[in-house]
């Protein structure tokens, strides 16, 4: 059975642990407890192939910036996560997570994952964001970011309702088993 190491990164509180717990146990966890490091393992079938999927959770908080990369060696695929209702976490994909992952693992495939899909249409959440002159991240915005960082796929999911959840991990496995041609991140040409 092929073993695949999948490391999940992203800002604190975007839902990385909930994503993993909901996927591996079919239950949504209760309160928020920041992660240091956790590993989960799941035996799954994708396209008729059995795979042992090793899932590595990481801490998004800055305090762990020096510790986190210790989980990066031998990673087969990264999930860079952001919350669809946190524009700051979305901006950090470009500012922090993509550069960090690429620095340590220049050729490892990346999937960009928008979490908390159930909250994008939630009236209270939209209202809270509007009060700060912000709005949830749209699908086209996520897709544009995925293209910019050369992500293999852009996916959205909800760990609470499990909508799109299985697809995230199936596509992560496919990115390793049948790698697409290498995409270079979009380069911008500026003429003065």
UniProtKB/Swiss-Prot annotation:
Annotated transmembrane regions: none
Reactions it catalyzes: GTP + H2O = GDP + phosphate + H(+)
Class of the enzyme per the UniProt entry, highest EC level: hydrolase
Per UniProt, location of the Glycyl lysine isopeptide (Lys-Gly) (interchain with G-Cter in ubiquitin) cross-link in this chain: 166
Chain positions found as Cysteine methyl ester: 189
UniProt keyword annotation of Hydrolase present: yes
PTM remark: (Microbial infection) Glycosylated at Tyr-32 by Photorhabdus asymbiotica toxin PAU_02230. Mono-O-GlcNAcylation by PAU_02230 inhibits downstream signaling by an impaired interaction with diverse regulator and effector proteins of Rac and leads to actin disassembly.
Tissue specificity as recorded in UniProt: Highest levels in brain, also detected in heart, placenta and pancreas.
Binding site for GTP: 10-17, 57-61, 115-118
Annotated phenotype, changing residue 166 to R: Reduced FBXL19-mediated ubiquitination and subsequent degradation
Sugar-modified residues: 32
GO MF annotations, alphabetized: calcium-dependent protein binding; G protein activity; GTP binding; GTPase activity; protein kinase binding
Activity regulation note: Regulated by guanine nucleotide exchange factors (GEFs) which promote the exchange of bound GDP for free GTP, GTPase activating proteins (GAPs) which increase the GTP hydrolysis activity, and GDP dissociation inhibitors which inhibit the dissociation of the nucleotide from the GTPase. Regulated by the GEF protein DOCK7.
EC number: 3.6.5.2
BP-aspect Gene Ontology terms: actin cytoskeleton organization; actin filament organization; cell chemotaxis; cell projection assembly; cerebral cortex GABAergic interneuron development; cortical cytoskeleton organization; establishment or maintenance of cell polarity; homeostasis of number of cells within a tissue
UniProt-listed InterPro entries: P-loop_NTPase (IPR027417), Small_GTP-bd (IPR005225), Small_GTPase (IPR001806), Small_GTPase_Rho (IPR003578)
Induction annotation: Expression down-regulated in quiescent fibroblasts and clearly induced by serum stimulation.
Motif placement: Effector region: 32-40
Presence of the UniProt keyword NAD in the record: no
Propeptide residues according to the Swiss-Prot or TrEMBL record: 190-192
Disease link: Neurodevelopmental disorder with structural brain anomalies and dysmorphic facies: An autosomal dominant neurodevelopmental disorder characterized by global developmental delay, severe intellectual disability, poor language, seizures, dysmorphic features, and thin corpus callosum.
Summary of the function given for this chain in its UniProt record: Plasma membrane-associated small GTPase which cycles between an active GTP-bound and inactive GDP-bound state. In active state binds to a variety of effector proteins to regulate cellular responses, such as cell spreading and the formation of actin-based protusions including lamellipodia and membrane ruffles. Promotes cell adhesion and spreading on fibrinogen in a CIB1 and alpha-IIb/beta3 integrin-mediated manner.
Quaternary structure annotation from Swiss-Prot or TrEMBL: Interacts with the GEF protein DOCK7, which promotes the exchange between GDP and GTP, and therefore activates it. Interacts with C1D. Interacts (via C-terminal region) with CIB1; the interaction induces their association with the cytoskeleton upon alpha-IIb/beta3 integrin-mediated adhesion. Interacts with NRBP.
Protein name, UniProt field: Ras-related C3 botulinum toxin substrate 3
Natural source organism: Homo sapiens (Human)
Organism ancestry: Eukaryota, Metazoa, Chordata, Craniata, Vertebrata
Gene (UniProt): RAC3
């Amino acid at each position: 059975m092929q073993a695949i190491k999948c490391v999940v990164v992203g800002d604190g509180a975007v839902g990385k642990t909930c994503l993993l717990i909901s996927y591996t146990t079919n239950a949504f966890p209760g309160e928020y407890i920041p992660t240091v490091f956790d590993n989960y393992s799941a035996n799954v079938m994708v396209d008729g192939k059995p795979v042992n999927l090793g899932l590595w959770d990481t801490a998004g908080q800055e305090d762990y910036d020096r510790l986190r990369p210790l989980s990066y060696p031998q990673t087969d695929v990264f999930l860079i996560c952001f919350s669809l209702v946190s524009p700051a976490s979305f901006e950090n994909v470009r500012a922090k997570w993509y550069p960090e992952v690429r620095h340590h693992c220049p050729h490892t495939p990346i999937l960009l994952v928008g979490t908390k899909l159930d909250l994008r249409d939630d009236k209270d959440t939209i209202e809270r964001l509007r009060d700060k002159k912000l709005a949830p991240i749209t699908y086209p915005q996520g897709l544009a970011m995925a293209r910019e960082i050369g992500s293999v796929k852009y996916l959205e999911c909800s760990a609470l309702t499990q909508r799109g959840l299985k697809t995230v991990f199936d596509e992560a496995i496919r990115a390793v088993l049948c790698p697409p041609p290498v995409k270079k991140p979009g380069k911008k040409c500026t003429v003065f």
